[in-house]
Amino acid sequence: PEEMNGDSILIQNFIYNDPECLADKKASIDKTPELVELFSDLFILYPFHKEKYGHCLTKLGGGMEHQTMSTMGGFGFWLVAHELGHMWFGDNVTCATWSDIWINEGFASYSEYLALQYLDSQSAANSMMNGVQNYVMSEPGGSV
């Protein structure tokens, strides 16, 4: 990010000690710096830039962000964007109560959309948004 004046942010990944694991995950892991830079440009500088950001691979599904380190079941583009988005909305800015958790999740989901819009295409972002809308609207009696 421009505000770093040529400095960098440490991105640290903990994966299984298996050469096949690295070969399988490397392309996805390598997208992380681009996402950090994008969100730093769109929001504010990565809030924990003086420390680091990273991932810890686990056999559990999905992901869970923790300040500066996300536990990940994989490195899918949407998942990485979502958990990274929580660094700004969830870890840097937190909710007053658990009933406000939708704010954190909403911004993290919006981060997925922004990542697609800027790093893939507007068409991909629109497709994601349509898919989410169709899913929500298909749930009888579900919350919106």
What spans do the regions from the language model cover?
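Structured beta-strand-rich cores of soluble
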Residues: P1-G6
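Hydrophobic alpha-helical and helix-loop surface patches within well-folded domains
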Residues: D7, N13-V144
